[in-house]
């Protein structure tokens, strides 16, 4: 199930160095697993992610979704930090309780210029989805060296 171009440890090191405000283990983000065309990412619980009503905010879930997609793309094509989100569509299905979230991303298309992924978000330890998303990433042209 692996064949990833970068390991979880390599990705955590690179993301921490290049995007220290976005990716920070102190904020509870960790890459649990990567494989070619996918990953599993955990976002620890923090009270600032709550919205009125005591549930995790949509903003927090969208950020986790985008991060999982980025990690799946990088794990599959290697370190190409200029890959960018071109579309993200999310459906909020259930209210997540105030605890950690896990996002599993599976790339359903991986081309030379575009990657399309499906992301399932669950509360840690639960089977039922709290959100489901699809996303598209554009990759810069790579030189033919």
Task: Identify the residue ranges that each predicted region occupies.
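A conserved beta-turn-beta hairpin within the catalytic core of GNAT-like acetyltransferases
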Residues: 50, 80-82, 113-115
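Hydrophobic beta-strand-centered segment that forms part of the acyl-chain substrate-binding groove
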Residues: 71-102, 107
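A generic structural signal for short beta-strands and their flanking turns/coil linkers
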Residues: 27, 37-39, 58, 82-88, ...
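Non-catalytic linker/capping segments at the edges of enzyme domains
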Residues: 1-42, 47
């Amino acid at each position: 199930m692996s064949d990833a171009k970068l390991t979880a440890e390599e990705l955590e090191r690179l993301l921490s160095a290049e995007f220290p405000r976005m990716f920070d283990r102190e904020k509870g983000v960790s890459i649990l697993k990567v494989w070619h065309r996918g990953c599993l990412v955990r976002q620890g619980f923090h009270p600032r992610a709550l919205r009125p009503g005591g549930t995790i905010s949509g903003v927090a879930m969208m950020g986790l979704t985008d991060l999982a997609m980025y990690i799946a793309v990088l794990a599959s094509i290697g370190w190409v930090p200029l890959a960018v989100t071109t579309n993200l569509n999310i459906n909020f299905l259930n209210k997540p309780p105030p605890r950690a979230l896990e996002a599993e991303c599976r790339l359903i298309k991986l081309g030379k210029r575009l990657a399309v992924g499906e992301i399932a978000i669950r509360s840690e330890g639960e089977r039922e989805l709290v959100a489901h998303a699809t996303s598209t990433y554009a990759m810069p042209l790579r030189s033919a060296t």
